């Protein structure tokens, strides 16, 4: 989860988020190099006589500033396309969970089980216990097995929502009449928090998401107790 005054990304918990973090660092390095080069050239122009006000044509320079940006864009596009493909690809999911957005709560249905569905509302501030997080705790957590590919089907019953869990690299739009798919895989157990990331009305800020990733045996015990 995020902390006050945090500057970096949340700790990566899924392979996708690890790839996104690496891509962020890769792109940031390119931006830093370009910015440094531009500032260096500007400083040279302001402090030296390396200017040619009468030069109207420079074929070599035009060739360089055409080819170099193309190479830079390719270096950014190739890893980006690879990650996009990874985010859309899912083979043989161990579990499928259908998520529906409402004003202003989430409902979940485990399609592999009969009658395993529930609504998830934010716990009001006055009802929080010591140590619980304001605006992030829910009455029913989404319990999922760790280290297994899980398919999330996301849609909405009313207006546009967005189901997002940053530490897992997840952000999927919930659109009425349409099912969007996302892949959830966690490398470790724990509680992972998210929120609706699409302005959906007056209580948009009160639609938290809590995923509880547990070992498979614990998940089987939980699902048996819920049915």
From Swiss-Prot:
InterPro entries per the UniProt record, alphabetical: CcO_II, CcO_II-like_C, CcO_II_C, Copper_CuA, Cupredoxin, Cyt_c_oxidase_su2, Cyt_c_oxidase_su2_TM_dom, Cyt_c_oxidase_su2_TM_sf
Cofactor binding comment, as recorded: Binds a dinuclear copper A center per subunit.
Protein source organism: Sundamys muelleri
Subunit: Component of the cytochrome c oxidase (complex IV, CIV), a multisubunit enzyme composed of 14 subunits. The complex is composed of a catalytic core of 3 subunits MT-CO1, MT-CO2 and MT-CO3, encoded in the mitochondrial DNA, and 11 supernumerary subunits COX4I, COX5A, COX5B, COX6A, COX6B, COX6C, COX7A, COX7B, COX7C, COX8 and NDUFA4, which are encoded in the nuclear genome.
Listed PROSITE patterns: COX2, COX2_CUA, COX2_TM
Bilayer topology term: Multi-pass membrane protein
Top-rank taxon: Eukaryota
Annotated Cu cation A1 binding sites: 161, 196, 200, 207
All ranges on the Mitochondrial intermembrane side of the membrane: 1-14, 88-227
Protein name: Cytochrome c oxidase subunit 2
Catalytic activity: 4 Fe(II)-[cytochrome c] + O2 + 8 H(+)(in) = 4 Fe(III)-[cytochrome c] + 2 H2O + 4 H(+)(out)
Cellular localization per UniProt: Mitochondrion inner membrane
Its biological purpose: Component of the cytochrome c oxidase, the last enzyme in the mitochondrial electron transport chain which drives oxidative phosphorylation. The respiratory chain contains 3 multisubunit complexes succinate dehydrogenase (complex II, CII), ubiquinol-cytochrome c oxidoreductase (cytochrome b-c1 complex, complex III, CIII) and cytochrome c oxidase (complex IV, CIV), that cooperate to transfer electrons derived from NADH and succinate to molecular oxygen, creating an electrochemical gradient over the inner membrane that drives transmembrane transport and the ATP synthase.
Listed GO CC annotations: mitochondrial inner membrane; respiratory chain complex IV
TM segment ranges: 15-45, 60-87
EC number: 7.1.1.9
Coiled-coil residue windows: none
Cofactor dependence: Cu cation
Residues reported to bind Mg(2+): 198
Keywords from the named record: Copper, Electron transport, Magnesium, Membrane, Metal-binding, Mitochondrion, Mitochondrion inner membrane, Respiratory chain, Translocase, Transmembrane, Transmembrane helix, Transport
Listed GO biological process terms: ATP synthesis coupled electron transport
UniProt keyword annotation of Membrane present: yes
Family (UniProt): Belongs to the cytochrome c oxidase subunit 2 family.
């Amino acid at each position: 989860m995020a902390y006050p005054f945090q500057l970096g990304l949340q700790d990566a918990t899924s392979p996708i988020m690890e790839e996104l973090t690496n891509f962020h660092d890769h792109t940031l390095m390119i931006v830093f190099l370009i910015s440094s080069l531009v500032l260096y050239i500007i400083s040279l122009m302001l402090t030296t006589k390396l200017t040619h006000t009468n030069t109207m044509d420079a074929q070599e320079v035009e060739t360089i500033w055409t080819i170099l940006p193309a190479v830079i864009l390719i270096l950014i596009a190739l890893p980006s396309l690879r990650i996009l493909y990874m985010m859309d690809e899912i083979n043989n999911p161990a579990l499928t969970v259908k998520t529906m957005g409402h004003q202003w709560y989430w409902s979940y249905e485990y399609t592999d089980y009969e009658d395993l569905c529930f609504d998830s509302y934010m716990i009001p501030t006055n009802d929080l216990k010591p140590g619980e997080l304001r605006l992030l705790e829910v009455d029913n957590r989404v319990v999922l097995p760790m280290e297994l590919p899980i398919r999330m089907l996301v849609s909405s019953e009313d207006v546009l929502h967005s189901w997002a869990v940053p530490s897992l690299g997840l952000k999927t739009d919930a659109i009425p009449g349409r099912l969007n798919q996302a892949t959830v895989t966690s490398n470790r157990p724990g509680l992972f928090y998210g929120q609706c990331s699409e302005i959906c009305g007056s209580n948009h800020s009160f639609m938290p998401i809590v995923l509880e990733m547990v070992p498979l045996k614990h998940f089987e015990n939980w699902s048996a107790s819920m049915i």
